[in-house]
Curated annotation (Swiss-Prot):
Matching SUPFAM superfamilies: FKBP-like, Triger factor/SurA peptide-binding domain-like
Gene for this chain: prsA
Residue stretches making up the PpiC domain: 197-287
Protein name: Foldase protein PrsA
Function: Plays a major role in protein secretion by helping the post-translocational extracellular folding of several secreted proteins.
Keywords linked to the UniProt accession: Cell membrane, Isomerase, Lipoprotein, Membrane, Palmitate, Rotamase, Signal
Listed EC numbers: 5.2.1.8
Keyword Lipoprotein: yes
Residues anchoring lipid (N-palmitoyl cysteine): C27
Membrane topology recorded in Swiss-Prot or TrEMBL: Lipid-anchor
GO biological process, one term: protein folding
Subcellular location: Cell membrane
Catalytic class of the enzyme: isomerase
UniProt-recorded Gene Ontology molecular function terms: peptidyl-prolyl cis-trans isomerase activity
Length: 339
């Protein structure tokens, strides 16, 4: 009897496992309808759910999807050639939509004037229709359909622009840049404020690690030829042909760490190892032009203006990140719905 009970338990467990696996397989075999796909969530921002349909009809994305469908055919999600790029592009657009939903949510707390927003949105929509469609409502609707977007998506797009601007004004209203900050920036970036455009003639050896760069520096300090070392060790693809000789180049054409190091060198001097996104450089300055700098007072206001815009963007982006945490933005569990 005990043996029979054990067998019954085993049979029940096996039957349950079989039924469960069949139900899972069945779920995977069922194709979602276009309507179900459109309603699939791709992100949640507070209480607001962004759906796949809203994402795919977002004007910038919709136009690109239409072009890709013309080029690669109907179901882009099954095209291995472009799948990764499609996911990346959609994720970028979704991030933009998330930011917009955050701004919509917070605009109520900040008491943004809705009547003013609506008036500005209607004005922008009219300009868009007049300039792109000569005010022809039927052509407007027809072309939006061809683009894969909707009137509702276009209106939301313009509304997001207006509300973002209004919210941003409130967030960054206290941001200031004083003369001292501008002066500090001028001194640190002096070579971007030159009357002429001086060039620098340099040779370098590029290696992967700081330790390797230190060894290169030691060999150069002992008098070894940089051309010989560049041909031997440099990971710069052009080094085999040019022996590390970069020719003459202006400050603006160099990556910043390299440029900042080279301006401190005198002719014939060799730098300490310099890290950039390419690796570690050891640089020898062959020659450089004489340089004349613009007077600080002549560029002060432009510097302040540029720094102010940069600081405003920084403050606004930080606020968005703060709000994102407050609203518990969720995208991870909806990743499978993005394509």
């Amino acid at each position: 009897m005990k043996h029979l009970k054990n067998n019954t338990k085993k049979f029940t467990a096996l039957l349950f496992a079989l039924l469960f696996s069949m139900s899972i397989a069945g779920c995977n075999m069922i194709e979602k309808t276009p309507e179900a796909i459109e309603k699939s969530p791709v992100a949640k921002v507070g209480k607001k759910t962004i759906t796949r349909g809203e994402l795919d009809t977002y004007p910038i994305l919709a136009e690109q999807l239409t072009k890709l469908k013309e080029q690669f055919g109907g179901d882009l999600s099954k095209n291995a050639e472009i799948k990764d790029q499609l996911i990346q592009f959609k994720s970028q657009v979704l991030e933009q939509m998330i930011q917009e939903e955050i701004v919509f949510e917070k605009s109520e707390e900040l008491k943004v004037d809705n009547a003013k927003v609506e008036k500005e949105v209607e004005k922008n929509l009219k300009n868009f229709m007049d300039q792109g469609f000569q005010g022809n409502k039927d052509k407007y609707k027809e072309d939006l359909k061809k683009m894969g977007t909707t009137e509702e998506s276009i209106k939301r797009f313009f509304k997001a622009q207006v509300i973002t601007e209004e919210v941003s004004k409130q967030v960054v209203k206290d941001v200031k840049v004083d003369d001292n900050t501008a002066k500090k920036h001028y001194e640190e970036s002096k070579y971007t404020f030159t009357v002429n455009k001086p060039t620098f003639h340099a040779q370098h050896v590029l290696v992967k690690t700081e330790e390797e760069a230190k060894k290169v520096k030691a060999r150069l300090d002992k008098g070894e030829d940089i051309k010989k070392i560049a041909k031997e060790l440099s990971i710069d693809p052009s080094a085999k042909e040019n022996s590390g000789d970069l020719g003459k180049a202006p400050y603006s054409s160099m990556v910043k760490p390299f440029a900042d190091a080279i301006v401190k060198l005198n002719k014939g001097e060799i730098s300490q190892p310099v890290k950039s996104q390419f690796g570690y450089h050891v640089i020898k300055l062959i020659d450089k032009d004489e340089v004349t700098f613009k007077d600080f007072n002549s560029v002060k206001e432009q510097i302040k203006k540029d720094l102010l815009e940069t600081e405003k963007r920084k403050v606004f982006n930080e606020k968005i990140e703060q709000w994102k945490k407050e609203l518990k933005v969720e995208t991870k569990k909806y990743e499978k719905n993005i394509i």
